[in-house]
Each structure stands twice: as C-alpha cells, then as structure tokens.
Curated annotation (Swiss-Prot):
Protein name stated in the entry: Glucose/galactose 1-dehydrogenase
Species in which this protein is naturally found: Picrophilus torridus (strain ATCC 700027 / DSM 9790 / JCM 10055 / NBRC 100828 / KAW 2/3)
Record field: catalytic activity: D-glucose + NADP(+) = D-glucono-1,5-lactone + NADPH + H(+); D-galactose + NADP(+) = D-galactono-1,5-lactone + NADPH + H(+)
Binding annotation for Zn(2+): 39, 66-67, 153
Record's keyword terms, sorted: Carbohydrate metabolism, Metal-binding, NAD, NADP, Nucleotide-binding, Oxidoreductase, Zinc
Residues given in the record as substrate binding sites: 41, 116, 153, 157, 304
Superkingdom, natural source: Archaea
Keyword Transferase: no
Similarity comment: Belongs to the zinc-containing alcohol dehydrogenase family. Glucose 1-dehydrogenase subfamily.
Cofactor note: Zn(2+) is of critical importance for the stability of the enzyme.
E.C. designation(s): 1.1.1.360
Family matches, as PANTHER family: L-THREONINE 3-DEHYDROGENASE
GO BP field: galactose catabolic process via D-galactonate; non-phosphorylated glucose catabolic process; protein tetramerization
Positions contributing to NADP(+) binding: 213-215, 273-275, 302-304, 347
Length: 359
C-alpha cells in the first residue's frame, strides 16, 4: 500500500488514500518525491475537463502528478551514475514506437502512442514512493536547487518552445538591423507560473517583454514582473499593445489569442502552448486570414519537451537561482501538505505556483 493523490480520469475528482499499485519484480531506481508541483493540467483532470486523460490500464484510478523533484532511495548500478541520496527530476512522457519516440523525441510523438505520467495511462508522482528507470531521470547536482528544481518540468516546456521559435523564425530575417532582438516585442498571454517562466526566457533573448491578462494582478506579481524588467497591462482596460513580434499564449483562449494576432508585425511568430478545451468559440473571418498570410505570420503549437530540454531547463534554473536576488524562488507562492487536496479545486489567492511537500 502507498499513500497517493488520485483521480478517476477522465471523469475527475480528487482524494488522498492508500492504494495498491503493482510493484515491479525488477527495477533500477526507487524514489520518494520531495516536492510535487500543481498546475492547470492537474486541476483540469480533477474537474473532468481533460477528455484525453485516462487511467493506467488495470486500475480504476490514476495517481496525479507530473511535476516533481525526488530523492533516490535505492538504485542499482546504471550508466547514468544515479545513486542513493541523489536528487532527480523524472521525465513525464514515456515513448511509444514511432520514429520520434525511438530517438528520444517523444515530445514530438508522431502517432500519439505515448504515455504521460499522471495524465495519460501512467501513474504520476504524487505518492510516497515509486519506481523508475535511470534513463528517465535528470540529476540535480546542486542541493541548494532542490526546491526550485520542482520548476524543471514546466521550464522544459519553455526550452522546447523557444527551440521551436528559433527554427520557425529562420524563415526570414527576424532580428532588427542591429542584429539583435533589442527592438523586438514579446507579449505573453497569462500570468501563471508557466507564463512567468516564458518571460524569464524571453528576457534572455533580449526582447522587450510584456505580460497581459484580462484582470489586474496583485502586488507580488507586479513586483516580480518589474524585477525581471518586464511590463504588465490589463488588456480589458488599456489600449491593445501593437507591434508584436513574438506572441506566446499560455491561456488556450482563442478569443484572446486572435485579439493579439491582429496586432502582429510582419514575419511575426505565434507560439501556442496553453490548452483549454472548455474555452468559448471565437469568430475568425477572411480578413483575419488575409492578415496572417499577407504578413507572413507563423502560428505554431508546442507541447512538452525532450530530455535534452530538461537538461537545459536545469541550466537556466541554476542561473536564475543565483542571479537577481533569486527572484525565481518567488514563483513558488505556497507549500502544502499532501492532505491539502482542496488546492486542486480552489486556487489559493495570488497563486503563481503551489507545490506539495512530501518529506
């Protein structure tokens, strides 16, 4: 028996209880979570809003959790030098058999036959212990990084998305005539933890960074936005920003997205990351299509990331952890016990990122 936070996918619901999970006869690594992160995907599952989520075969429940920093309890000899006492981040997606999955790019799975821990057919990390293979773990060498390393999983999404941007933006000369992005504007829709991580990375690219939402934000969020030299505006009260070169959406709301697509500069790039199957429909007419075509605007979706993106995420989190007064740590706004399952259905006030402390 193991204590776990579970749902019944795709129907939803959440509870913590002791459950029977078959233990492998042979395993490389036994892990205990230290912190697990909570995000919109977890809440969507609990509310029954993610129709693509499903239980692990053979079980009438699914253990939640795909963001985690864990400590190794036991480990057999392995080529990755993972040993007891190490801190590691487990990779979420597990490969199927398509060509991309076979080369470690399950983030670009060609046929959808992959699994995602805590989401699609594979138990997640919100439990007292679990087993895994060493190849699915990313080691955290700096013990001062343990808490902030819970942000590795969402940060790897950002690394992948900017890699996509690098590829797509090569269709034309994207930079200004000084060969930089210093005169280019990046607008990020949303003010959740993922949006902030996108803002951190956009700043690395030397964009002028803007964050927007349909409502005012609290003083803590405004303070962080200012600290990273970004700007915020409430698009329902202020004139829409014009002249956008890179638009990143974390909301999944089509009406909001197309509000700003119509403000894109020539050769602009739109990265669609947020998902929200319950978002209302929006109207798109021929002029919108003309606008996109005549300006060579690229709209591209980006999901998940490969193991290499986890490694890059750790590098940037280390940099941000030791720079600018460790402002990255301020994204973690609440630490809760596993029994506090109410946070899955009621978002804490002024939340950016809530995490669960397991030990």
């Amino acid at each position: 028996m193991v204590r776990a936070i579970i749902t019944n996918a795709p129907n939803g619901g959440v509870k913590i209880e002791n459950v029977n999970i078959n233990e492998p006869e042979h395993y490389e690594v036994k892990l205990r979570p230290v912190y697990t992160g909570l995000c919109g995907t977890d809440r969507g599952e609990v509310l029954g809003n993610l129709s693509f989520a499903y239980n692990e075969p053979g079980y009438n429940y699914l253990v939640l959790g795909h963001e985690a920093i864990c400590q190794v309890i036991e480990a057999s000899e392995n080529p990755y030098k993972i040993k007891p006492g190490d801190y590691v981040v487990p990779v979420v997606r597990r490969p199927g058999k398509c060509v991309n999955c076979r080369i470690g790019r399950e983030d670009d799975c060609s046929d959808g036959d992959k699994h995602e821990a805590g989401i699609t057919g594979l138990h997640g990390f919100m439990r007292d212990y679990f087993y895994d293979e060493a190849k699915n773990l990313v080691k955290i060498n700096d013990k001062n990084m343990v808490k902030v390393a819970v942000l590795t999983e969402p940060t790897k999404n950002v690394m992948k998305a900017f890699e996509v941007f690098d590829t797509v933006s090569k269709r034309s000369i994207f930079q200004g005539d000084d060969s930089t992005n210093l005169t280019k504007n990046c607008l990020i829709i949303g003010t959740g933890s993922e949006a902030f991580l996108y803002a951190f990375m956009a700043r690395e690219y030397r964009f002028n960074v803007f964050m927007t939402n349909r409502h005012p934000v609290g003083e803590e969020k405004l303070s962080i936005i200012s600290r990273i030299n970004a700007d915020f505006y409430d698009y329902t009260r202020e004139d829409p920003l014009k002249g956008i070169d890179l638009l990143i959406d974390t909301s999944g709301d089509p009406g909001t997205i197309f509000r700003f697509v119509r403000k894109m500069n020539y050769n602009g790039v739109v990265i669609l990351f947020g998902t929200n199957g319950r978002a209302p429909a929006t109207s798109i007419d021929g002029e919108d299509i003309d606008y996109i075509i005549e300006r060579n605007i690229s709209l591209v979706g980006s999901v998940d990331g490969a193991k290499r993106h986890y490694l890059r995420a750790v590098e940037y989190l280390e940099k941000w952890n030791y720079s600018e007064g460790s402002v990255i740590n301020r994204l973690i706004t609440g630490v809760f016990e596993p029994e506090d399952v109410s946070i899955f259905t009621k978002k804490p006030e002024n939340e950016i990122k809530s995490v669960i402390k397991w030990s």
